[in-house]
Structures are given as C-alpha cells and as structure tokens.
Amino acid sequence: MKRWWILLGIAAMACLLSPFQGTDVGKLRPAQWVYLSRDGETVLVRTDLGDLGKGGGVGEALGDLMESAPGALFLDTADYILVSPECADLIPNMGGWVRGAAEVYVTAAPPDEETGAFLEAHRGKTLLRDCMLGTQALSGLTRDGERWILIDG
C-alpha cells in the first residue's frame, strides 16, 4: 500500500514538473465572418482575417483554409456567413464548420473590413440552422457606393 502512494506521488510530481505545451495566444485566429464564393469550378472561402481556402467543394475549401491559416483558425466564432449568389446552394454544407447560430447573408459585393461592424449594428434574421432546415428566406446584403445596405429576407 505504501508503495502505491510513493508511485502516485512520483507520477504527480512528474506531471507538475514536466514542461507544459501551451498555445501561443498570438497564433489564435477567431474569425468574425466567412465569405463563400466561386471562381469557375473552384469554391473559395475567405475570412475577415484575410485567410483564403480553395477547393472543389465547400469541405475541401474549408479544409484548405484551416491548413493554410498561419495559426489556429476558429470558424466556430464566426457570427456571419456571407455567400455570393452563385454559392447559395452550398450553404447547407457549412454545417459542422460554422455554428448554427451564425447569421447568413447573400451578397454580390465581396465583404471588406467594414462589413463586420455594419452587421454588428444591423442584425439580420436568417440563421444557418434555419437555412439548413429551409425555414427562413435568406437576408441580402448589398453595397451602395461606400455603404452597406441590409435587405431582410
């Protein structure tokens, strides 16, 4: 019995004194929005952080995005999914990559650094989970010169 306590103590000391493997906070990359578009047959996925993924389908493009990001990219922090009109049929493929409570917008204009702030101030009604169930019309987002305009679905 005494021997087990000694072994347990040694194991506890080894755990406490061993080097910790943490993650450099500077390498954590939480995305605010994800933009889905096409270039011919190639699906493109871009984030507000400037990361880009390409592939033959959504899963392949998102996988490429995760691999090519210079750090730990978090898509489940994304509040918004922006989709070009030609990719609207791909929205259900975003499930499992982005949380179901993310708002979905169709936009012909590519997002920029002001898009996230605009969407924070003007909330849409369409969530990814609703799109996957087909229960909600898509909200639109358009650009008029320098300003964004929300078109609720």
Locations of the language-model features?
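Membrane-proximal alpha-helical signals and transmembrane carboxylates
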Residues: M1-G153
